[in-house]
UniProtKB/Swiss-Prot annotation:
InterPro entries: CDPK_Ser/Thr_kinases, EF-hand-dom_pair, EF_Hand_1_Ca_BS, EF_hand_dom, Kinase-like_dom_sf, Prot_kinase_dom, Ser/Thr_kinase_AS. Residues 419-453, 454-489, 490-525, 528-562 form the EF-hand domain. Its cofactor is Mg(2+). Residues 394-429 are annotated as: J domain. This is Calcium-dependent protein kinase 5. It is an enzyme of class 2 (transferase). Its EC number is 2.7.11.1. It holds the Pfam family Pkinase. A motif (J domain EF-hand interaction motif) lies at residues 403-412. Ca(2+) 3 binds at residues 503, 505, 507, 514.
Length: 562
C-alpha cells in the first residue's frame, strides 16, 4: 500500500513538537527554519493596484513618505486619473478591486492607534517581530486581533510586504482575514480576524489523537484553503498545527490558517529554492532546494498523520535528527496506534507523503479520494426547497441594487464577524462540491435544483451579478454579501466603515477618481468610459454636485434614498 520503507520506528514521545515561548497567535516558533529571500520576484506595495516592482522605500513600509501630510492621521490618496482622457466609446461593466477593502493608513503619532482601538494588555501571542493583542474598535465595538510589529526588529521588509499583499488577495472561510494596516514611526499594525478558540496544536496535546471523522472535518478545511490559495498560485510553506486556530471554543468551531509570512507566489511549472518551514512539517524537497506547491500537501499529510495517532511521522531528539529523517522520507504505521485506522486513511496519508513531489497527489484530487468521499456523505447538507427559494429571493434583491450599494455591501460582508453568517457559511460550503473555496454557477444550480428552463435563465443572470470582482466565480464574500441581512445597513458605524474604503483621502466625499481607484474592467485593468463612472455617481448623487457625500451614501445604504 505505502511506498515508504518500514524501517523507521517511532522514537517514542512527541519530542519538542513546539517549544512554548509565550507565542503563538502569529505562529513564530524557535524551531522555524531561518527564512531567506525567494528566487521568485520580490513583490512590494504599489500606490493603486499593488503591482510587482523592485524598488524599496526604506523609510515607510506600507506608504510612501510623501503621503505624510500636516493632519494627524491621513489615509493614502487615490491615484490621480484624468477622466477626460478615457475612451468614451467603451461600454463596459465595472468590477470591484476587492484588495482595496483592506485599508492602509499612516498614523502621524505613535499613540493614534489607541484613539481607534482599545488595546488589551493581555498578549494573545508573541513572535520575533512583536506581539499580538486583542483590540476593540471604539466606533463599532467589534473585537479584532492586532499584530504589533516593531519596525526596528524587521530583518526582511520584503517578506513582510509580500505577506500583506498575499493576505489582501485572500477570501476563504478558513483563511485568516486582514482588515486594516496602520503604520507609525516605530511600528506596523496588522488588524486581523480575532480567533479565540486556541491552536490546533493545543487540541492535539489535550486529546492525544482524533477520530477519523473529527480528523476529516479538520483536514477538509485545510485542503479547501490550500485548493483556494494554490489556484491563485500561492503557497503557505509553513503549515503546522501552531498556525491553525479555532475561531471560538465551540465544538463545531471552524479553523483558520494563519501566519502567511513564509507564503510566496509559485507559478505552474516554476520551482522555488528558499529553505523555509518547520522541521516536523517541512517537505524533503524544500531541504533539497527545489520544490513547488505540493510542499504544502506534504505538510498537510504530516498534520493528518499526527491527528490520527498523536505523534509525528518524522520524530527525533532534536531538529537535526528530525531533518535527517525527513530527508529520508521513511515512516511507518505502528500497529500499536494504527490498527484501528482505516486503510483508506493510510492510503491518503501515503499519497500526501509521497517522497517524489511530482507524483504527490494534487490538492484538487483529494476531494475525490475514497476516504474523503466516505465522510463527505456523512456530512452532506441538504438544501431544501424553502432555503432554495429564500436564496433566490435574496439574489433577486441584490441584483436590483445600484452598483455602489452592491460594492459597499461587499465591503461590509468582508468586515463582519463570521458568527454573523453561521447559516450562510454552511450553505456556501454545501454548495462548494469540489472543495476549492469558491463557487461556480454550475455548483449553485446543482444545489438549488431549479428545473424550469425559464427560471434557469433568470437565475443564471442573477448569479452573474453576484460576481462583483469579475473573476468568473462567486467568492466567499460575494456570496455572503448577497445573503446579508439589510437591517445592519441602518447602523451608522457600519456604513461609515464602508464609506471610508471609497473615500481614499478622507475628505468626506467620494469622487470619480476615487471610484476608479476601486474599480477595474474584469481582469484586464482596462479603463472605463467617462459616462460609466458618471452614471455610477449619479445613481447616488442626490444634489447633482458630481460627488457622493456621506449623507447621500447613508441614505442609499439604509434605503431612505428618495
Amino acid at each position: 500500500m505505502c511506498e515508504h520503507k518500514a524501517n523507521n520506528k517511532n522514537d517514542g514521545e512527541f519530542v519538542n513538537l513546539k517549544e512554548k515561548n509565550e507565542n503563538n497567535h502569529c505562529g513564530n516558533t524557535k524551531s522555524t527554519i531561518a527564512d531567506c529571500d525567494d528566487d521568485y520576484s520580490i513583490i512590494t506595495l504599489c500606490t493603486k493596484c499593488l503591482s510587482t516592482k523592485t524598488e524599496v522605500n526604506k523609510n515607510k513600509i506600507i506608504l510612501d513618505s510623501k503621503a505624510l501630510k500636516d493632519s494627524r492621521t491621513k489615509r493614502r490618496s487615490s491615484v490621480n486619473i484624468n477622466i477626460d482622457i478615457l475612451n468614451n466609446n467603451l461600454n463596459l461593466s465595472p468590477y470591484f478591486d476587492r484588495s482595496q477593502i483592506v485599508q492602509e493608513t499612516i498614523l502621524m503619532n505613535n499613540d493614534d492607534l489607541e484613539k481607534l482601538y482599545e488595546l488589551d494588555k493581555y498578549k494573545l501571542g508573541k513572535g520575533s517581530y512583536g506581539n499580538v493583542v486583542k483590540a476593540i474598535n471604539k466606533k463599532t465595538g467589534q473585537a479584532k486581533a492586532i499584530k504589533i510589529i516593531d519596525k526596528k526588529r524587521i530583518n526582511n521588509i520584503e517578506r513582510l510586504k509580500r505577506e500583506i499583499l498575499i493576505m489582501k488577495q485572500m477570501d476563504h472561510p478558513n483563511i485568516i482575514k486582514l482588515y486594516e494596516v496602520y503604520e507609525d514611526n516605530e511600528k506596523l499594525y496588522l488588524v486581523l480576524e480575532l480567533c479565540t478558540g486556541g491552536e490546533l496544536f493545543d487540541k492535539i496535546v489535550k486529546h492525544g489523537s482524533f477520530s477519523e471523522y473529527e480528523t476529516y472535518k479538520i483536514m477538509k478545511q485545510i485542503f479547501s484553503a490550500l485548493a483556494y490559495c494554490h489556484s491563485k498560485n500561492i503557497i503557505h510553506r509553513d503549515l503546522k498545527p501552531e498556525n491553525i486556530l479555532y475561531v471560538d471554543s465551540s465544538d463545531d468551531s471552524p479553523i483558520q490558517i494563519i501566519d502567511w509570512g513564509f507564503a510566496s507566489k509559485c507559478m505552474n511549472n516554476h520551482n522555488l529554492k528558499s529553505v523555509v518551514g518547520t522541521p516536523y512539517y517541512i517537505a524533503p524537497e524544500i531541504l533539497k532546494g527545489k520544490y513547488d506547491k505540493k510542499c504544502d500537501i506534504w505538510s498537510s499529510g504530516v498534520i493528518m498523520y499526527i491527528l490520527l495517532c498523536g505523534y509525528p511521522p518524522f520524530n527525533g531528539k532534536n531538529n537535526d535528527d528530525i531533518l535527517k529523517k525527513v530527508k529520508k522520507g521513511e515512516f511507518v504505521f505502528d500497529s500499536n496506534y494504527w490498527s484501528k485506522i482505516s486503510l483508506d486513511a493510510k492510503e491518503l496519508i501515503c499519497e500526501c507523503l509521497n517522497y517524489n513531489y511530482k507524483e504527490r497527489i494534487d490538492v484538487h484530487k483529494i476531494v475525490n479520494h475514497k476516504w474523503f468521499i466516505k465522510f463527505k456523505n456523512y456530512n452532506h447538507i441538504t438544501i431544501n426547497k424553502h432555503l432554495s427559494k429564500e436564496l433566490i429571493e435574496k439574489f433577486k434583491k441584490f441584483h436590483k441594487l445600484c452598483k455602489i450599494k452592491k460594492l459597499a455591501i461587499t465591503c461590509i460582508a468582508y468586515q463582519l464577524n463570521k458568527k454573523k453568517f453561521g447559516k450562510m457559511k454552511k450553505t456556501f460550503e454545501a454548495f462548494d462540491h469540489n472543495g476549492d473555496g469558491v463557487l461556480t454557477i454550475s455548483e449553485i444550480f446543482q444545489c438549488l435544483k431549479v428545473g424550469d428552463n425559464e427560471i434557469d435563465r433568470d437565475l443564471y443572470y442573477l448569479l452573474k451579478q453576484l460576481d462583483t470582482d469579475g473573476n468568473g466565480l462567486i467568492d466567499y464574500t460575494e456570496f455572503l454579501a448577497a445573503c446579508l441581512d439589510h437591517s445592519i445597513l441602518e447602523q451608522d458605524a457600519v456604513c461609515r466603515n464602508a464609506f471610508k474604503i471609497f473615500d481614499a483621502n478622507g475628505d468626506g466625499i467620494i469622487t470619480k477618481d476615487e471610484l476608479l481607484n476601486v474599480l477595474s474592467f474584469s481582469n484586464d485593468q482596462m479603463p472605463f468610459s467617462k459616462e460609466i463612472i458618471e452614471n455610477v455617481i449619479k445613481e447616488v448623487d442626490a444634489n447633482n454636485d458630481g460627488y457622493i457625500d456621506y449623507d447621500e451614501f447613508y441614505k442609499m445604504m439604509s434605503g431612505r434614498q428618495s
